[in-house]
Amino acid sequence: NLETHGQKSNAVLVPREAKSFIVDQVYDYPHVVKKSTRVVQPTFDIIVLGYKEPDLQENYEAIKSKHHTAKLVSGIEGNVNAYKECARQSHTEYFWCVFAKSKLEHGFSFNYHPDCLERPHHYIFKCYNPMIDYAYGHMGIILYHRQMVLDAKEWGPDFTCSFPVKLVDQISNTANYFH
């Protein structure tokens, strides 16, 4: 049996024979046993990404006041170049990308953890759009898989959605479309 420990299976004991079964994700192996052992969840880097937003510094400082290790990446030409720079600045398996022209939702805690048995995904959180009174993925905080961003050579019109993604049904921020 392959044994997992922790709420999101972030500690795994894998038998040697499992290698021949796993193609895409650990769930390919037919004998997975989830244990309820408490395991400390890793934290992921938080990176505020901006370009020339007038309130970039203010929004960054608001996040940094609550999350002291948050980093700022700004002034990079082109979205993909900016995402790749965020990935280079990160030292964790995943990193949170917060768009500087949005305000963090009160109570959003950056504590989501991917299921470690699944293949890597980017995780898109909902963003509230006050212009239409609706929350959806556009401009939401994204939990990027660092290596997937660094390794990207080809992508479609939307960089993030060119790779495996999951939408997380949680409002992370409010967009400011007026900047």
Kindly give the residue locations of the regions a language model identified.
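Short loop/turn segments at strand-loop or loop-helix junctions that form parts
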Residues: 16, 49-51, 98-101, 126-128
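The conserved acidic donor/metal-binding loop of glycosyltransferases
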Residues: 1-3, 99-103
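Short aromatic/hydrophobic "clamp" motif used to bind/position activated sugar donors
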Residues: 95
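Catalytic-site signature of metal-activated, phosphate-bearing donor transferases
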Residues: 2-38, 111-179
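Acidic donor-diphosphate engagement hotspot in glycosyltransferases and nucleotidyltransferases
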Residues: 107-109
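N-terminal anchoring/stem segment of glycosyltransferases
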Residues: 6-7, 13-89
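Short active-site-proximal "capping" loops at secondary-structure junctions
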Residues: 77-79, 101-104
